[in-house]
Amino acid sequence: MSTQQTHLKQLEAESIQIMREVAAEFENPVMLYSVGKDSSVLLHLARKAFYPGKIPFPLLHVDTNWKFKEMIEFRDRMAKQYGFDLIVHKNPRGLEMNISPFTHGSAKHTDIMKTEGLKQALDMHGFDAAFGGARRDEEKSRAKERVYSFRDSKHRWDPKNQRPELWNIYNGKVDKGESIRVFPLSNWTELDIWQYIYLENIEIPSLYLAEPRPVVKRDGTLIMVDDERMELEPGEAVEQKMVRFRTLGCYPLTGAVESQATTLPEIIQEMLLCTTSERQGRVIDNDSAGSMEKKKMEGYF
């Protein structure tokens, strides 16, 4: 067995242990399923953790109404293929207001359709623990967040009041109304994720692989034209470029990267040479300085 396989097996074992502990410790856990590569790895780990039984908690997808069409198709196909319980929630207030990233801006769209939508779903179903696919190498606010991330009754995160985590000992004590966000992939890197996907043959949306796609260059970011709702600004033109996505979200707020990587080995090779963050394409991370930390303090993923 190679060193890399040993390393990935150690990460796998750690993540599975965390999942089993949460399933045993909490009354009503849920897994947040955003349909991306990290969610795909989480789903694979959950299936392994509880095999041959069924995953003992539902998966929750907070649908903003602006996800890539392929993401929705992939989500529904995975639910049918693996038979897990899927909860899809859309913020009804946001739908009534017809919230759009074009007319309302990325900050308001994210706050209403993502953050508020997530808090609504967690409260509606009374979940006391929620698995997420965040990793510490993604972004600086996530780098300092614990594996068990305590949230108060308003789902707020206080980065200055986090619980100590010694070795693999986690404190899951919560009072009524409080909850824990759990991040089993905290110690994984983007390269780990891709190598694990390749070794375990995990299915992912084809948006991660490069192919010619219609894009518009806006503020230095390549935005894919995914449907007829895409609003072009004066002087913009749609062009075909060989692109892929390193991260997936709402299509008007997710930048593509030019790439020739059409296979997983080519993506892994690209990652070995890459010096930029995968979240450079997330428009919401550029709303203001420390925007991600502020969003998390308000209840974001």
From Swiss-Prot:
Pathway noted in the entry: Sulfur metabolism; hydrogen sulfide biosynthesis; sulfite from sulfate: step 1/3
Molecular function terms, GO-annotated: ATP binding; sulfate adenylyltransferase (ATP) activity
CDD domains, per the entry: Sulfate_adenylyltransferase_2
Domain of life: Bacteria
EC number: 2.7.7.4
Enzyme class at the top of the EC tree: transferase
This protein's record includes keyword RNA-binding: no
Subunit structure: Heterodimer composed of CysD, the smaller subunit, and CysN.
Annotated NCBIfam families: CysD, PRK05253.1, PRK12563.1
Catalysed reaction, written as an equation: sulfate + ATP + H(+) = adenosine 5'-phosphosulfate + diphosphate
Entry-linked InterPro entries: PAPS_reduct_dom, Rossmann-like_a/b/a_fold, SO4_adenylTrfase_ssu, Sulfate_adenylyltrnsfr_sub2
Keyword Transferase belongs to the record: yes
Protein name per Swiss-Prot or TrEMBL: Sulfate adenylyltransferase subunit 2
Role this protein plays: With CysN forms the ATP sulfurylase (ATPS) that catalyzes the adenylation of sulfate producing adenosine 5'-phosphosulfate (APS) and diphosphate, the first enzymatic step in sulfur assimilation pathway. APS synthesis involves the formation of a high-energy phosphoric-sulfuric acid anhydride bond driven by GTP hydrolysis by CysN coupled to ATP hydrolysis by CysD.
HAMAP family the record matches: Sulf_adenylyltr_sub2
Gene Ontology terms: biological process: hydrogen sulfide biosynthetic process; sulfate assimilation
Keywords: ATP-binding, Nucleotide-binding, Nucleotidyltransferase, Transferase
Family that this chain belongs to: Belongs to the PAPS reductase family. CysD subfamily.
